[in-house]
Structures are given as C-alpha cells and as structure tokens.
A protein has these predicted regions:
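Canonical alpha-helical transmembrane segment with a positive-inside/aromatic-interface signature
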Residues: 1-46, 51-53
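Cytosolic, positively charged, low-complexity intrinsically disordered regions immediately flanking transmembrane
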Residues: 14-15, 39-62, 66, 73-83
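Long, low-complexity, charge-dense
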Residues: 136-137
Length: 137
C-alpha cells in the first residue's frame, strides 16, 4: 500500500492546478507518476462504471509494453479542441490520496506539461464525481 503522497499546486495562467503522486498498477509491476487532479474529467467506462484516467504518450508507451495489457475498447471525449477517440486498457489499480481504485487508462498521443496522467474526478479528495462521458466497447 502507498501511504502519504505529496500534492503540488502550480500556478498556470489564470488558475491553479493540483498535481498528486499516483501509483498505477498493471500486470506484475507499478509505475509512480505525477497526476493532474482534474475536476472536469468525468470519463467512465460504460460497461463497468469504472473511472478512466487519461495518460500521456510516454506513459501510454510504458503501459502498452506491460505483460498482459491489451486494448479493451475506446473512449469518446470532447474538449475545447474538438472530439476524439482514445483506446483504453485495463489497470489493476490507481493509488492516489491513500486510496486505490480499479480503473481504465485512455492512451493519449500527447505530451502533458508537468504530469503524466489526468485523474478522473472521483479518484481524488475534492472530486465531485457525477455523470460524464462514457467509454465504448
């Protein structure tokens, strides 16, 4: 189990962003990453109801090379930049803020600035949860 963790609040533009240390478990291994706590990420898998974490291109490559990882479906997401479809893979768990949840990872082809994953809003304290976009299989 992962205890503690650190939170970073970084100024960027007009607002602030909260970065937490997260541990992503998949297969027989785990990866420690910096993750953005995004109250706007409401992505969930429609079949299971599990949260969907969006991961950077670099982290996506690491996950794709893990034993037993395969594309299990796609998530449709809409942002200011447009609508897009991302492949998803199953994770054994994501630990953040002292809590572990089973989740999916949406594999992005983008590099993120200062973090490697974007957490779904129910995964961290302060997240509101609620309805959102769904992953299709």
């Amino acid at each position: 189990a992962v205890a503690g963790g650190r939170a970073i609040v970084a100024s960027r533009g007009k607002g602030q962003r909260r970065i937490e240390n997260a541990v992503i478990s998949v297969g027989s291994g785990s990866l420690s990453v910096e993750a953005l706590c995004d109250s706007g990420n409401t992505l969930t898998d429609v079949a299971s109801g599990l949260p969907v974490v969006i991961v950077s291109e670099n982290l996506a490559q690491k996950l794709r090379s893990a034993d037993g990882v395969r594309i299990e479906g796609f998530v449709e997401a809409a942002t200011v930049g447009g609508q897009f479809s991302l492949p998803i893979v199953g994770l054994d768990g994501v630990t953040v803020c002292g809590r572990t949840v089973k989740a999916y990872a949406a594999l992005s082809e983008r590099t993120f600035d200062g973090y490697e994953a974007i957490l779904q809003n129910t995964m961290f304290d302060g997240g509101r949860g609620g309805r959102g976009l769904s992953a299709k299989r």
